[in-house]
């Protein structure tokens, strides 16, 4: 599965390259 970088939208399983997935105003995004 692909992973997302910080500031990008999380994948369906919430996988981030680093950091974690949070619920942001514009949807679920990865943060460090």
From Swiss-Prot:
Lineage of source species: Eukaryota, Metazoa, Ecdysozoa, Arthropoda, Chelicerata
Any GO CC annotation of this UniProt entry: extracellular region
Keyword Phosphoprotein: no
Family, per entry: Belongs to the neurotoxin 17 (21C2) family.
Tissue: Expressed by the venom gland.
Name the UniProt record assigns to this protein: U6-ctenitoxin-Pr1a
Record's comment describing the protein's domains: The presence of a 'disulfide through disulfide knot' structurally defines this protein as a knottin.
Keywords carried by this UniProt record: Disulfide bond, Knottin, Secreted
Disulfide linkage: 3-17, 10-21, 16-30
Species annotation: Phoneutria reidyi (Brazilian Amazonian armed spider)
Subcellular locations according to the entry: Secreted
Family annotation (InterPro entries): Toxin_29
């Amino acid at each position: 599965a692909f992973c997302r970088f910080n500031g990008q939208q999380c994948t369906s399983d919430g996988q981030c390259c680093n950091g974690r997935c949070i619920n942001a105003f514009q949807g679920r995004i990865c943060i460090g």
